[in-house]
Swiss-Prot record:
The lineage of its organism: Archaea, Methanobacteriati, Methanobacteriota, Methanomada group, Methanococci. It holds the Pfam family Cupin_1. This is Uncharacterized protein MJ0764. Gene3D superfamilies: Jelly Rolls (2.60.120.10). InterPro entries: Cupin_1, RmlC-like_jellyroll, RmlC_Cupin_sf.
Length: 116
């Protein structure tokens, strides 16, 4: 078999953070945030695409005002940008994080650096 299949949790109602794919070229995470949850504020450790598949994401980059993005949106975040992802408005926010190239290719840590 040439292809490789990855599975992710479906219909989660609690917070989920799964590192699904971690190859030399790309890193793909699956995240579910119930209302009121957020990811720790951190710096993007690669060129990031946020693929929102359920709910509405509130995203704050650097010192900008927060912006809301809904399911069906793909949001690009450049390398080394301070970011905060929150679920303020939806019962469930579900999204994928695609990091390409893999952070190691940019001499960045594999896990993002948290900030205040």
């Amino acid at each position: 078999m040439i292809e490789k299949v990855y599975e992710f949790k479906r219909d989660a109602k609690t917070k989920v953070v799964e590192k699904l794919v971690n190859t030399e070229h790309v890193q793909i995470n699956h995240i579910v945030l119930p209302r009121g949850e957020q990811m720790p504020k951190h710096y993007s450790n690669s060129y990031v695409h946020l693929i929102i598949i359920k709910g509405e994401m509130t995203l704050t980059l650097e010192d900008q005002e927060p912006h809301n993005y809904k399911e069906g949106n793909i949001v690009y975040v450049p390398f080394n940008v301070k970011m905060l992802i929150q679920n303020i408005n939806s019962d469930i926010l579900e999204f994928f994080v695609v990091k390409a190239p893999h952070p190691k290719k940019l001499n960045a840590p594999e896990d993002p650096i948290k900030c205040e």
